[in-house]
Amino acid sequence: MLAKRIIPCLDVRDGQVVKGVQFRNHEIIGDIVPLAKRYAEEGADELVFYDITASSDGRVVDKSWVSRVAEVIDIPFCVAGGIKSLEDAGKILSFGADKISINSPALADPTLITRLADRFGVQCIVVGIDTWYDAETGKYHVNQYTGDESRTRVTQWETLDWVQEVQKRGAGEIVLNMMNQDGVRNGYDLEQLKKVREVCHVPLIASGGAGTMEHFLEAFRDADVDGALAASVFHKQIINIGELKAYLATQGVEIRIC
Protein backbone atom coordinates (compact mmCIF):
# COMPACT_ATOMS: atom_id res chain seq x y z
CA MET A 1 0.00 0.00 0.00
CA LEU A 2 1.28 3.47 -0.86
CA ALA A 3 1.80 5.80 2.08
CA LYS A 4 -0.82 8.51 2.50
CA ARG A 5 0.45 12.05 1.92
CA ILE A 6 0.21 15.20 4.02
CA ILE A 7 0.37 18.24 1.75
CA PRO A 8 0.53 21.85 2.93
CA CYS A 9 -0.98 24.26 0.43
CA LEU A 10 0.49 27.71 -0.12
CA ASP A 11 -1.77 30.18 -1.93
CA VAL A 12 0.41 32.84 -3.53
CA ARG A 13 -0.60 36.37 -4.46
CA ASP A 14 1.75 39.27 -5.23
CA GLY A 15 4.76 37.21 -4.17
CA GLN A 16 3.44 36.30 -0.71
CA VAL A 17 1.53 33.43 0.84
CA VAL A 18 -2.08 34.34 1.62
CA LYS A 19 -5.10 32.49 3.01
CA GLY A 20 -8.81 33.13 2.74
CA VAL A 21 -12.06 31.54 3.86
CA GLN A 22 -14.22 29.96 1.14
CA PHE A 23 -11.84 31.56 -1.39
CA ARG A 24 -12.56 35.10 -0.07
CA ASN A 25 -11.03 37.77 2.20
CA HIS A 26 -7.40 36.70 1.93
CA GLU A 27 -4.92 37.70 4.61
CA ILE A 28 -1.15 37.72 4.23
CA ILE A 29 0.54 34.76 5.95
CA GLY A 30 4.20 35.35 5.09
CA ASP A 31 7.01 34.88 2.60
CA ILE A 32 7.02 31.90 0.27
CA VAL A 33 10.50 30.42 0.68
CA PRO A 34 10.75 30.40 4.52
CA LEU A 35 7.31 28.79 4.80
CA ALA A 36 8.19 26.15 2.22
CA LYS A 37 11.39 25.36 4.09
CA ARG A 38 9.56 25.12 7.42
CA TYR A 39 6.98 22.66 6.11
CA ALA A 40 9.64 20.49 4.48
CA GLU A 41 11.54 20.37 7.76
CA GLU A 42 8.37 19.52 9.71
CA GLY A 43 7.87 16.42 7.58
CA ALA A 44 5.48 17.38 4.77
CA ASP A 45 5.39 14.80 1.99
CA GLU A 46 4.82 17.36 -0.73
CA LEU A 47 3.93 21.04 -1.17
CA VAL A 48 1.40 22.67 -3.48
CA PHE A 49 1.67 26.29 -4.58
CA TYR A 50 -1.30 28.08 -6.16
CA ASP A 51 -0.78 31.48 -7.75
CA ILE A 52 -4.44 32.22 -7.10
CA THR A 53 -4.97 35.22 -9.39
CA ALA A 54 -2.86 34.10 -12.36
CA SER A 55 -5.73 32.59 -14.37
CA SER A 56 -8.22 35.35 -13.62
CA ASP A 57 -5.53 37.96 -14.44
CA GLY A 58 -4.71 36.21 -17.71
CA ARG A 59 -1.05 35.59 -16.82
CA VAL A 60 1.10 32.62 -15.92
CA VAL A 61 2.44 31.91 -12.44
CA ASP A 62 5.33 34.16 -11.39
CA LYS A 63 8.30 31.86 -11.90
CA SER A 64 10.88 33.85 -9.94
CA TRP A 65 10.16 32.07 -6.66
CA VAL A 66 9.86 28.55 -8.12
CA SER A 67 13.62 28.07 -8.51
CA ARG A 68 14.24 29.54 -5.05
CA VAL A 69 11.86 27.00 -3.50
CA ALA A 70 13.58 24.17 -5.42
CA GLU A 71 16.92 25.23 -3.91
CA VAL A 72 15.78 25.00 -0.27
CA ILE A 73 13.50 21.93 -0.12
CA ASP A 74 14.12 18.28 -0.90
CA ILE A 75 10.52 17.09 -1.21
CA PRO A 76 8.33 17.16 -4.34
CA PHE A 77 6.31 20.27 -5.05
CA CYS A 78 3.54 21.18 -7.45
CA VAL A 79 2.89 24.60 -8.98
CA ALA A 80 -0.37 25.98 -10.37
CA GLY A 81 -1.48 29.25 -11.85
CA GLY A 82 -2.47 30.24 -15.37
CA ILE A 83 -0.60 27.41 -17.12
CA LYS A 84 -2.17 27.46 -20.58
CA SER A 85 0.50 25.96 -22.84
CA LEU A 86 3.22 23.34 -23.11
CA GLU A 87 5.74 26.16 -22.99
CA ASP A 88 4.36 27.51 -19.69
CA ALA A 89 4.47 24.05 -18.13
CA GLY A 90 7.94 23.28 -19.47
CA LYS A 91 9.39 26.44 -17.95
CA ILE A 92 7.95 25.75 -14.51
CA LEU A 93 9.18 22.16 -14.55
CA SER A 94 12.61 23.34 -15.73
CA PHE A 95 12.81 25.70 -12.73
CA GLY A 96 12.53 22.69 -10.42
CA ALA A 97 8.84 21.94 -9.87
CA ASP A 98 8.01 18.22 -9.88
CA LYS A 99 4.40 18.61 -10.99
CA ILE A 100 2.21 21.23 -12.55
CA SER A 101 -1.46 21.65 -11.78
CA ILE A 102 -4.10 23.10 -14.07
CA ASN A 103 -7.60 24.15 -13.16
CA SER A 104 -9.35 27.03 -14.94
CA PRO A 105 -7.26 26.64 -18.14
CA ALA A 106 -8.36 22.98 -18.35
CA LEU A 107 -11.99 24.06 -18.21
CA ALA A 108 -11.35 26.60 -20.96
CA ASP A 109 -9.55 24.04 -23.14
CA PRO A 110 -9.82 20.39 -21.99
CA THR A 111 -7.41 19.27 -24.73
CA LEU A 112 -4.66 20.97 -22.71
CA ILE A 113 -4.73 18.06 -20.25
CA THR A 114 -3.97 15.53 -22.97
CA ARG A 115 -1.28 17.65 -24.60
CA LEU A 116 0.50 18.15 -21.28
CA ALA A 117 0.23 14.45 -20.36
CA ASP A 118 1.58 13.40 -23.76
CA ARG A 119 4.54 15.77 -23.49
CA PHE A 120 5.54 15.48 -19.84
CA GLY A 121 3.91 12.23 -18.65
CA VAL A 122 0.74 11.74 -16.63
CA GLN A 123 2.72 11.45 -13.39
CA CYS A 124 3.35 15.19 -13.28
CA ILE A 125 -0.03 16.46 -14.51
CA VAL A 126 -2.46 17.35 -11.72
CA VAL A 127 -5.94 18.71 -12.32
CA GLY A 128 -7.41 20.91 -9.60
CA ILE A 129 -11.19 21.01 -9.34
CA ASP A 130 -12.94 23.80 -7.43
CA THR A 131 -16.26 22.26 -6.44
CA TRP A 132 -19.23 24.00 -4.81
CA TYR A 133 -22.23 22.28 -3.24
CA ASP A 134 -25.51 23.93 -4.23
CA ALA A 135 -27.91 23.25 -1.37
CA GLU A 136 -30.92 24.21 -3.50
CA THR A 137 -30.28 21.61 -6.19
CA GLY A 138 -28.35 19.12 -4.07
CA LYS A 139 -25.65 19.01 -6.76
CA TYR A 140 -21.92 19.67 -6.87
CA HIS A 141 -20.81 22.12 -9.55
CA VAL A 142 -17.34 23.02 -10.85
CA ASN A 143 -16.33 26.68 -10.54
CA GLN A 144 -13.80 28.58 -12.64
CA TYR A 145 -11.53 31.61 -11.98
CA THR A 146 -12.02 31.25 -8.23
CA GLY A 147 -8.92 33.31 -7.38
CA ASP A 148 -10.85 36.53 -8.08
CA GLU A 149 -14.28 36.88 -6.50
CA SER A 150 -15.49 39.26 -9.21
CA ARG A 151 -14.61 36.80 -11.99
CA THR A 152 -15.60 33.50 -10.39
CA ARG A 153 -18.24 31.66 -12.36
CA VAL A 154 -20.12 28.39 -12.16
CA THR A 155 -19.42 26.17 -15.18
CA GLN A 156 -21.81 23.78 -16.89
CA TRP A 157 -19.89 20.84 -15.44
CA GLU A 158 -21.15 18.83 -12.51
CA THR A 159 -18.22 17.70 -10.38
CA LEU A 160 -18.55 13.93 -10.87
CA ASP A 161 -18.77 14.34 -14.65
CA TRP A 162 -15.68 16.57 -14.76
CA VAL A 163 -13.72 14.15 -12.56
CA GLN A 164 -14.37 11.42 -15.11
CA GLU A 165 -13.65 13.69 -18.08
CA VAL A 166 -10.23 14.82 -16.86
CA GLN A 167 -9.18 11.23 -16.21
CA LYS A 168 -10.10 10.27 -19.77
CA ARG A 169 -7.96 13.14 -21.00
CA GLY A 170 -4.85 12.15 -19.04
CA ALA A 171 -4.94 13.64 -15.54
CA GLY A 172 -2.46 11.78 -13.35
CA GLU A 173 -3.88 13.11 -10.09
CA ILE A 174 -6.90 15.12 -8.94
CA VAL A 175 -7.04 17.70 -6.17
CA LEU A 176 -10.63 18.26 -5.07
CA ASN A 177 -10.94 21.77 -3.62
CA MET A 178 -14.21 21.78 -1.68
CA MET A 179 -15.11 25.44 -1.64
CA ASN A 180 -17.90 25.29 0.96
CA GLN A 181 -15.44 23.88 3.50
CA ASP A 182 -12.42 26.01 2.58
CA GLY A 183 -10.80 27.67 5.60
CA VAL A 184 -13.75 26.85 7.89
CA ARG A 185 -11.95 23.99 9.69
CA ASN A 186 -15.09 21.91 10.23
CA GLY A 187 -13.77 18.85 8.43
CA TYR A 188 -13.54 17.63 4.86
CA ASP A 189 -16.76 16.97 2.93
CA LEU A 190 -16.66 13.20 3.35
CA GLU A 191 -19.91 12.64 1.44
CA GLN A 192 -18.55 14.36 -1.62
CA LEU A 193 -15.16 12.67 -1.31
CA LYS A 194 -16.76 9.22 -1.16
CA LYS A 195 -18.81 9.94 -4.29
CA VAL A 196 -15.74 11.20 -6.15
CA ARG A 197 -13.63 8.27 -4.92
CA GLU A 198 -16.06 5.85 -6.59
CA VAL A 199 -15.34 7.33 -10.03
CA CYS A 200 -11.74 8.49 -9.47
CA HIS A 201 -9.13 5.88 -10.42
CA VAL A 202 -6.07 8.13 -10.11
CA PRO A 203 -4.65 9.52 -6.86
CA LEU A 204 -7.23 11.75 -5.15
CA ILE A 205 -6.24 14.61 -2.86
CA ALA A 206 -8.78 16.12 -0.45
CA SER A 207 -8.64 19.89 0.02
CA GLY A 208 -10.77 22.19 2.15
CA GLY A 209 -11.95 21.88 5.74
CA ALA A 210 -9.17 20.40 7.87
CA GLY A 211 -9.35 21.69 11.43
CA THR A 212 -8.23 18.79 13.63
CA MET A 213 -6.06 15.70 13.35
CA GLU A 214 -9.25 13.63 13.37
CA HIS A 215 -10.37 15.35 10.16
CA PHE A 216 -7.29 14.01 8.37
CA LEU A 217 -7.94 10.54 9.78
CA GLU A 218 -11.57 10.61 8.55
CA ALA A 219 -10.50 11.58 5.04
CA PHE A 220 -8.02 8.71 4.86
CA ARG A 221 -10.11 6.09 6.65
CA ASP A 222 -13.65 6.91 5.49
CA ALA A 223 -13.09 8.35 1.99
CA ASP A 224 -9.87 6.49 1.12
CA VAL A 225 -8.16 9.56 -0.32
CA ASP A 226 -4.48 9.32 -1.22
CA GLY A 227 -3.49 12.66 0.23
CA ALA A 228 -4.89 15.40 2.43
CA LEU A 229 -4.12 19.00 1.63
CA ALA A 230 -4.51 21.80 4.17
CA ALA A 231 -3.44 25.39 4.66
CA SER A 232 -4.71 27.39 7.62
CA VAL A 233 -4.11 24.71 10.28
CA PHE A 234 -0.46 24.62 9.24
CA HIS A 235 -0.01 28.34 8.57
CA LYS A 236 -1.43 29.24 11.99
CA GLN A 237 0.46 26.39 13.68
CA ILE A 238 -2.72 24.78 14.97
CA ILE A 239 -1.38 21.41 13.84
CA ASN A 240 2.27 20.36 13.62
CA ILE A 241 2.93 18.06 10.67
CA GLY A 242 5.24 15.71 12.58
CA GLU A 243 2.73 15.32 15.40
CA LEU A 244 -0.09 14.78 12.90
CA LYS A 245 1.79 11.98 11.18
CA ALA A 246 2.62 10.32 14.49
CA TYR A 247 -1.08 10.44 15.42
CA LEU A 248 -2.16 8.98 12.08
CA ALA A 249 0.37 6.16 12.45
CA THR A 250 -1.11 5.23 15.85
CA GLN A 251 -4.51 5.04 14.14
CA GLY A 252 -3.23 2.53 11.60
CA VAL A 253 -2.79 4.90 8.66
CA GLU A 254 0.12 4.01 6.36
CA ILE A 255 2.19 7.19 6.56
CA ARG A 256 5.82 8.19 6.12
CA ILE A 257 7.25 9.09 9.52
CA CYS A 258 10.05 11.64 9.40
From Swiss-Prot:
- What positions does UniProt annotate as the active site of this protein? 11, 130
Q: What is this protein for, i.e. what is its function?
A: IGPS catalyzes the conversion of PRFAR and glutamine to IGP, AICAR and glutamate. The HisF subunit catalyzes the cyclization activity that produces IGP and AICAR from PRFAR using the ammonia provided by the HisH subunit.
- Which BP terms from GO are recorded? L-histidine biosynthetic process
Pathway annotation from the record: Amino-acid biosynthesis; L-histidine biosynthesis; L-histidine from 5-phospho-alpha-D-ribose 1-diphosphate: step 5/9
Keywords, ordered alphabetically: Amino-acid biosynthesis, Cytoplasm, Histidine biosynthesis, Lyase
HAMAP family, A to Z: HisF
The enzyme's first-digit EC class, named in words, is lyase
Put simply, this protein is called Imidazole glycerol phosphate synthase subunit HisF
Q: What is its EC number?
A: 4.3.2.10
User: How the protein assembles, per its UniProt entry?
Assistant: Heterodimer of HisH and HisF.
Q: Which InterPro entries does its entry note?
A: Aldolase_TIM, His_biosynth, HisF, IGPS_HisA/HisF, RibuloseP-bd_barrel
Family note: Belongs to the HisA/HisF family.
Give Gene Ontology CC terms: cytoplasm
Instruction: Name its cellular compartments.
Output: Cytoplasm
**Substrates-to-products reaction catalysed:** 5-[(5-phospho-1-deoxy-D-ribulos-1-ylimino)methylamino]-1-(5-phospho-beta-D-ribosyl)imidazole-4-carboxamide + L-glutamine = D-erythro-1-(imidazol-4-yl)glycerol 3-phosphate + 5-amino-1-(5-phospho-beta-D-ribosyl)imidazole-4-carboxamide + L-glutamate + H(+)
